[in-house]
């Protein structure tokens, strides 16, 4: 039984139970770790916003740890600000003028007296200079050491680290590409197509697939421009491009005592524009022994750079072989599917590791917790018109979230909140667990029929945004009883029974878990 530390805040009471860790419904019970709060951090500042900030706040609250939010001018009334014990303004509207202002965040740390900082994902989560500045203040950084971030943040040096650890890598360069002729020579030696990639990038940005030698010069220049615009550096490298691989990643956690465990695999192959949309755990239909080999290779790659805290090693898998792709030195957006099949609270483990605690479980104990299958669907505020799926900022006039057995919904928004054009358009994540993959798929499809959101763009009539899941449009999209086919599919309707017997409808069940 964990001791409870009382806090003075009352904002945590209320109707937010469907979000975050406590919204897991009937997912596997969390693994409770025995420890004393005397050794744990006392106040955590979350240098982020949206659903990941809410996720960290809820995990910290379960440990009795006070939380501090930071916010831009646009996020003054955001959910993560409402939930935190304290909140400090960063000023500005865009990310560059707020959440990426190092000095403003460092000042908030000093004023709040926080003894730890959780970076979430995005923003400063993989910035070694930011992590170093935090630790030099005598404040715990809830993440890996700066040196590991530096080595794994550079795709070229991370390939070298993976080789040192014995992980197989895609044929490619372990140095920056200096000229188009060098890339052409690589393509001729290793075969086409090839991929030119930003050395300091990710998410598909700064990546160009080249089919032949004649296209190399233009593709290299384009990749360098894009890399410079998005990541501030234009170095690129080249590797063999696999035409139809699966994207399989390994979640791991290490402590500051040299122990690292891999928790599960995840399949993230369902992508759009090289960005993940649907993830599942464990990765299905891998040949015998491949998952274990991936896990062991991930641990070796992490140990090669002295890694600790949560991280993810990404592999590509094709024709029975897997290759190291990169390492994300942070918590992933899709981490809940791993939590769903293991019952392990990964954010809690992050906090414990940052406190200097050893890992609470051995590798064998971690693998023994796994059961069932989980799927995550990302819900984005987008306009599907014309198949473009462009970001659709505005006010969420209605947010109806799925619930039920094995269902969890993580979000940084509630009805009435604003989705800003200045930030990521991720509204939430639907996480569904089933006793096997078929059950998880069926349950995901069933829960995806819940209307997710209705967004009113600024200075425009209210319109329906499908958020990438099947929904029915509101009455405002209908004229003379007809449906506007360009918005959403028609809702499923049951035909009325002839002379139906009266039925007693059960009351909708309320979530019994406290957020």
Regions found by a protein language model. Give the residues of each.
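Short hydrophobic alpha-helical segments enriched in small aliphatic residues
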Residues: 13-17, 25
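N-terminal beta-alpha lobe that positions the nucleotide/phosphoryl donor
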Residues: 32-313, 317-334
């Amino acid at each position: 039984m964990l001791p409870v530390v009382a806090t003075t805040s009352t904002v945590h009471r209320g109707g937010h139970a469907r979000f975050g860790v406590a919204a897991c419904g009937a997912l596997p019970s969390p693994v409770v770790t025995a420890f004393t709060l005397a050794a744990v951090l006392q106040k955590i500042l979350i240098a982020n916003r949206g659903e990941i900030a809410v996720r960290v706040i809820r995990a910290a609250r379960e440990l009795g740890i006070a939380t501090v939010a930071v916010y831009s001018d646009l996020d003054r009334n955001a959910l993560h600000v409402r939930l935190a014990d304290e909140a400090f303004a960063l000023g500005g509207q865009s990310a560059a003028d707020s959440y990426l202002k190092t000095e403003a965040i460092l000042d908030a740390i000093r004023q709040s007296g926080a003894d730890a900082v959780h970076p979430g994902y995005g923003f400063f989560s993989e910035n070694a200079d930011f992590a170093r500045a935090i630790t030099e203040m005598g404040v715990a950084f809830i993440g890996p050491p700066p040196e590991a971030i530096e080595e794994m943040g550079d795709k070229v040096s991370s390939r070298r680290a993976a080789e040192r650890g014995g992980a197989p890598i895609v044929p490619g360069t372990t140095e920056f590409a200096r000229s188009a002729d060098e890339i052409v020579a690589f393509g001729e030696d290793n075969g086409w197509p090839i991929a030119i990639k930003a050395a300091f990038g990710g998410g598909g940005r700064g990546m160009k697939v080249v089919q032949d030698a004649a296209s190399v010069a233009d593709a290299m220049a384009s990749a360098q421009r894009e890399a410079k615009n998005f990541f501030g550096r234009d170095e690129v490298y080249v590797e063999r491009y696999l035409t139809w691989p699966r994207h399989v990643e390994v979640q791991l956690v290490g402590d500051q005592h040299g122990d690292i465990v891999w928790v599960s695999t995840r399949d993230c192959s369902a992508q759009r524009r090289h960005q993940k949309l649907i993830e599942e755990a464990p990765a299905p239909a891998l040949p015998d022994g491949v998952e274990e080999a991936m896990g062991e290779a991930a641990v070796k790659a992490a140990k090669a750079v002295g890694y600790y805290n949560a991280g993810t090693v990404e592999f590509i898998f094709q024709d029975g072989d897997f290759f190291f792709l990169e390492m994300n030195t942070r918590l992933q957006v899709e981490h809940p599917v791993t939590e769903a099949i293991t019952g392990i609270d990964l954010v809690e483990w992050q906090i414990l590791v940052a406190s200097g605690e050893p890992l609470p479980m051995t590798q064998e104990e971690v693998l023994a917790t796994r059961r069932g299958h989980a799927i995550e669907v990302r819900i984005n505020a987008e306009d599907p018109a014309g198949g473009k799926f462009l970001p659709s900022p505005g006010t969420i006039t209605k947010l109806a979230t799925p619930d039920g057995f094995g269902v969890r919904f993580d979000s940084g928004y509630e009805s009435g909140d604003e989705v800003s054009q200045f930030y990521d358009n991720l509204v939430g994540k639907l996480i569904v667990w089933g006793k096997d993959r078929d059950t998880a798929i069926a349950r995901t499809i069933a829960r995806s029929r819940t209307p997710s959101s209705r967004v009113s763009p600024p200075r425009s009539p209210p319109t329906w945004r499908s958020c990438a899941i099947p929904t029915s449009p509101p009455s405002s999209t209908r004229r003379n009883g007809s449906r506007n086919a360009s918005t959403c599919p028609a809702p499923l309707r049951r035909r009325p029974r002839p002379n139906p017997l009266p039925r007693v409808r059960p009351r909708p069940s309320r979530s019994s878990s406290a957020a």
